[in-house]
Every structure is written in C-alpha cells, then in structure tokens.
Amino acid sequence: LHEPYRRQRQMCIRDRQCPVHKDREPGCIPACSITDGFGGAGAYSDGKFNITSEFGGWLTDYLSNDEVEDVIHYVDNLYLKHGATKEITDPTTDKVKEIEHRGYAVGLKLLRAKVRHLGTEENLRIMTEMSNELKQHMDLQFKTAVQDIIVEDHHATGIVLENGQTIHAKKVVLAPGRDGSAWLTKVLSNQGLKLYNNQVDIGVRVETSNIVMEEINKNLYEGKFVYNTSVGTKVRTFCSNPSGHVVIENHSGTMLANGHAYHDPKLGSKNTNFALLVSHTFSEPFNEPNEFAHEISKLANKLSNGSVIVQRYGDIKRGRRTTYKRLKEGYTDPTLPEAVPGDLGLVLPYNTMKSIIEMIEALDNVTPGIANEHTLLYGVEAKFYSARPKVRDGFESEIDDLYVAGDGAGLTRGLAQAGANGILVARHI
C-alpha cells in the first residue's frame, strides 16, 4: 500500500524459524518460514546476489540491460550499507575462460555474473536491519491475510482483509512473493485481468564432495550452466552452495528439496550442492504447469512418507533404488539425514530423468567426478513460475494505481532483480 503501510499474512523476520535449526519448532504455520514472511524466499536463501541482467528475472522485457543493471547496483549498495560482504567474484579471469571453453566443447553454456555471496546467516541479519529501518518510516503488520483489492472506476483504492476490515490508499502495490503467486493470480483474475504462464522447472538437488567442485567453487562460486538435451529439453544448474547443506522446503504442503550455505566457514559441510532443473513448457489445452510440478513432487512425498527421496547416481544408472545400506556405503555423506533412500525413476517423467542424466554426463567434462556413482540426487526440486499480468510503465497493472512486483508477479527470480523491481515501482509512484 502506498501511504507507507504494509500488510502480510506471514511472519516478521524475527519470528521466522527455519526447520534447519533442529532445536526449534519449525515455523510452518501459517506458512513455511523458508519461503514466507518478511524478506520472502530470499531471506532464508543462502544469499547469492548476482550482479547481472542476464538471469534472475525478466525486467529486461521492459527496460534495457543497462537500466536494469544500474538499479541492481543501487540495490547492491543498499546491501553494502547494511554490512554485506565486500567480497565479489570476478567472472572474467583466464581460469573462468578455460572453464567456459571446456563447457562449450560439450554443449554447455556458462552464464557469467559477478556474485556477492552473503550467506544464510548474514542474509538474515541484513534483512533484520532493513526491517528495523523500515519500521521507522512505515507501519508493518504481519499475520494478516489480505482477501481482495478494492477497485472503483478502474482505479485501485485499497484492500479488504480476511476479517472484513477495509483499508483505503491512493496506490496499492502487490508483491506477495513466490508462495503468494496463486493468491495474486486469483485476486487479479477476479478483476478480469489476464495472466500468462505455461512453464515450470522440475528436477533434483545434486550433492557431491567439495573436492569434485573445487575448481568451480574457487573461480566462480556458482557455475551457472545451460544445456540443450537430445530430447529437446533445456536443463540448467541453479543455486550452487559450496560447503552447503541440503534442506527441505514446505510449499503449501508439498515438500521440496533445496539448499543453502553459510558465510561462516565454521558452519559449512564437506559437500557442495546445486540444483539441476529441467524446463517444462506446455501447450493448449493444459494450463496448470505449477499444479503438474506439485503432483510430481507429492508423489515423492508419498513414497518417502512425507519427506524427499535421495538416490545415488550410480544406482540411477543401474536402474535400481538406493537403500540405506547402499547410501551408507557411499563416499558422499548426505547433509539432509531426513531424506529417504529410494528410486527417483518412480517419480520423475522419462524425459526429465533422461535430461538430468545427460546434463550430469556433460558436466563431468567441466568438473570431473560429478558423474561418479557416489553423487547424490535429492528429489523433487521444483521452481514454480508465477503467472505474469500485463504491466505498463513503472510496473503498473491494467488497473490504474495498482502495481505488481517481484517473484510472485512472475517478473523476477532472485534477490537482485526482485530488489530492483521494488525500487523501480517506488520511483514511479
């Protein structure tokens, strides 16, 4: 809401409790603490701030690359103001070019970016500082569900809360985050606005030894590669976490694999984890890609009794399930002990699994050892694409004085562009 006022059904930053902290009660009510609350999905991420317009969102559909990167640098300076690390990777070194060359030789494209790794614990501290600063200039209210928006003469004039209370404002900004995308779709559809999305990413979280990933970790921190498979799909690496931990996220009752890494080396593991995601694009008449991913993920939940499945790559190639005995005999110690050994072949569609295998074999030419039989795959990991409404200058919707922003509006996919999107909306208002 413009008037500086903010309503949110989830929790404030200090009340968010990640299930990773085993001595605490997981904060899953009213929503998952990893993805919901102040700071959104970014607050409990491992805090990779990618300074690039090449990935992390679609702001370049509306602005030039230079304009987007200028705002990203502005957001980056805000993070630095609140104590973010000054360390940043250099994607232009000779060593990076050598890695890129090896990738091209086998059909892998490297996406370069300067990366400022904040770390999960530092990211939370920075978000807390930002929250405290905002409280000095605006009213924040949490655990308050917004039911609808008020529209009069094609102008947004306020919101309706779940308890029936109405709040009026000159401008309304909807930025509900990834887990609020379904809510945003419902609210805007009820107003007659059309939203567009027919894609979802489905894959696994890969975990291997830091030794295997040492060259990538040292020179890139996160190696973002894209690969076109023999079955016509596109696979990408995503969210690499050196010395990281695999975790479980609760997406509205669907348990998904994910990963994070701390900035403090003392909190790290001996493993690196990253996602391998296969893009799934559908044609008519099907128009529920996110539900498709939920159903696949729920099958893994059912087979693992409410958790996620872990399988050794060697067992996948042999067409057999991983057992507790085989997992224990492996050289990679899983950082997510709650994951249940099983068979991802019973869960993932054929083309999805084939795409993942082809990608791992290609990556083995860039980082030798990743295709060894002890590499672990956790499933399912999915990235839901939020439906995107049509927007005008300043990300104003087709309803006057109603603005949308961030991952929940299908405009961004990461810390940098999400922050930039918010700044652009604020400047326009």
Which functions belong to the PLM regions below?
Residues 171-220:
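Glycine-rich loop(s) and the adjacent beta-strand/alpha-helix scaffold that form part
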Residues 1-9, 13:
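Single conserved hydrophobic/aromatic residue that forms the stacking wall/gate
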Residues 339-412, 419:
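A glycine-rich dinucleotide-binding beta-alpha-beta segment and adjacent secondary-structure elements
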Residues 15-138, 183, 190:
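Conserved N-terminal/central alpha/beta ligand/cofactor-binding core
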Residues 225-331:
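FAD cofactor-binding and catalytic pocket of flavoenzymes
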Residues 183-186, 408-429:
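A conserved FAD-binding loop/helix module that cradles the flavin
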Residues 142-155:
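A conserved short coil-to-beta-strand element within the FAD-binding core of flavoproteins
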Residues 146, 159, 166-178, 402-404:
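Short hydrophobic core segments
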